[in-house]
Design a protein with these regions (language model features):
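Active-site loop and adjoining helix of the penicillin-binding protein/serine DD-peptidase-beta-lactamase fold
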Residues: 1
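Domain-terminus/edge residues, biased toward the C-terminal soluble/receptor-binding domains
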Residues: 4-183
Length: 183
């Protein structure tokens, strides 16, 4: 549940990282009696101890012990590690780092920002124009956890013949990616 909530937070509100990565901050508190400055430090020591750390939340009570929902980013891959009921703060950081390193060690990312390297056209039957220009709406990302050689990814562009009317936003084909004979 903690991992799911953390994923929702960092996905829907990525600006949380602007706050969760702050190590120390001086705050000025102003009242009618004047102002005073005091320092706040992040209780998530992972921020200082792990170069890929991006947050997120620590917690501890006598019942729950020491807990952490840790987020990190390395080579375009985001990870979440949740540790609970640790005996102390140092152990929670050590175990979170071990989990994150394990995850990053298992994951490789294949990314194709421009799925189409050239402009493609689909034939159009009964149209005012014989061809419709095609473009991709977004790039392609694949996270591999099997240790496959991602340089072996094959890409195939398939364009289907269209019948008029063809309007902007209509799908005229697809880009298919294969790795080890799997799509």
């Amino acid at each position: 549940d903690i991992a799911l909530m953390s994923r929702e937070l960092i996905t829907k509100y990525p600006q949380i990282e602007d706050y969760s990565t702050i190590w120390m901050e001086n705050i000025t508190h102003t009242t009618a009696k004047g102002s005073s400055e005091f320092g706040l430090s992040n209780t998530n020591k992972l921020i200082r101890q792990y170069e890929y750390a991006t947050g997120l939340k620590t917690g501890s009570t006598s019942g729950a012990k020491f807990c952490l929902s840790a987020t990190a980013r390395k080579d375009g891959v985001n990870m979440i590690a949740v540790v609970m009921a640790e005996p102390d703060s140092k152990t929670r950081i050590k175990d979170a780092i071990a989990m994150l390193n394990y995850g990053f060690g298992k994951c490789s990312i294949y990314q194709d920002e421009k799925a189409l390297e050239k402009i493609v056209y689909a034939e159009v039957k009964h149209g005012m124009q014989e061809k419709a220009k095609g473009e991709t709406l977004e790039g392609f990302r694949y996270v591999d956890t099997s240790g496959s050689d991602l340089s072996a990814v094959e890409k195939e562009v398939q364009i289907q013949k269209q019948t008029a009317p063809v309007k902007k936003g209509d799908q005229i084909g697809e880009v298919i990616y294969r790795l080890n004979e799997k799509t």
